[in-house]
Amino acid sequence: MPFIPHTPDDIEKMLAVIGAESIDQLFDEIPSALANIQQVPPGLNEAGITRLMEKREPNKQLCFIGAGAYEHHIPAAVWEIATRGEFYTAYTPYQAEASQGSLQLIYEYQTMMAELMAMDVSNASLYDGASALAEAALMAVRIKRGKAQRILVPASVNPFYRKVLSSIVEQQKINVEIIPFDPTMGIVNSELLKAKNAEGAAAIIIPQPNFFGCLEAVDVLTDWAHANDLLVIASVNPTAMALLKPPGQWGQKGADIVCGEGQPLGVPLASGGPYFGFMCCKKDYVRQLPGRIVGRTVDKKGREGFTLTLQAREQHIRRSKATSNICTNQGLAVVAATIYLSLLGATGLREVALASHTQSRDLFQRLSAVKGVSPVFSSPIFHEFVVRLEKPVEEVLAAMAEQGIQAGFSLKNDYPKLGNGLLICVTDTKTDDDLMAYENALRSIQ
């Protein structure tokens, strides 16, 4: 039986009360042209609505620049919650018992990051991905008790990270040794590495994916390092870990320390920051882990609570013997990352990673067919890739910008041997129309 709430008599009585003679008169403010619309477009999800509104912005440019900072769709709820007064601070509380809500959130963040990386322990965050890598190198030397003062660093590690790493560790008499990458594959040549003398080295850094977007042979590199008594420091993109093998499962024993940039997890691009670094490690090394650690415990009445644990490692307890001088960390960004991961869940994060990879592969294939554009490396990629241009890369970037496209990151300064190399990034924010616009713009220039 159909549910009909109002009979014709009911409608007439209601119209009489409000002084309208008919339904048409009641809705006379609606333009008559709209009355004959037969088709209403299908509904959009939040990401679709965001893209629709951004297209109406006259100066909005399509951004295909990655190089360590990535544009992903961030649900509106993330920062709506993160900027509530209860969370809106960068500080980790010193008096743990006074801020149980904040500590519980950080504890949940640590749990999710440890699970995502398949590691035992996570800290509460570090300043950014570059300083996290430097902290990981210092941690490796401490674990080796200073007997090894050399860190092996592939040239395929983010060049900005390498500069920060060198600036910090070389002041402590730790040598950074650069390992060249294979010019055709874009990754560490594992066969050449096997012939390398690893004596006196504390650790090797393994990026995944590397700066070129290529996927390193992580299992082979990890097993080689452990066979030569080196620690393995994994520097990873957290979004990629939703698709790829997590560092804790690399090789036979897994990575020893994992670090990286947390910006892809719900933190928007903002002229370089603030972002946040993350770090995880094996349980055996937790006392050398820098930064705050939140633990779960019970009080004397048996009630569950959260507290800052292992504080003897930190500078506010023993400054001269602290594992680091990380003070405020990036608590607010961690709040956003926790909300982001909670909203997306494992399935949602995997969908973001898969969409980024799929769209990147699509653009790679499109550009491979453009005259004057050639792929540089043959290794599998995640969501970035390198092409070589016939024309000077600066001219191409300027011409693309005039057409509303930030086309990528020039490799000319950091990797001059690659010539007119261009690093291009594609994420889940890019549609098929965006990829076509990039292809057509590049064809018109080349």
UniProtKB/Swiss-Prot annotation:
Keyword Oxidoreductase: yes
Pfam families listed in its UniProt record: GDC-P
Gene symbol of the encoding locus: gcvPA
GO function term, MF aspect, one: glycine dehydrogenase (decarboxylating) activity
CDD domains named among the record's database cross-references: GDC-P
Quaternary structure note: The glycine cleavage system is composed of four proteins: P, T, L and H. In this organism, the P 'protein' is a heterodimer of two subunits.
Enzyme nomenclature, EC number: 1.4.4.2
Protein name: Probable glycine dehydrogenase (decarboxylating) subunit 1
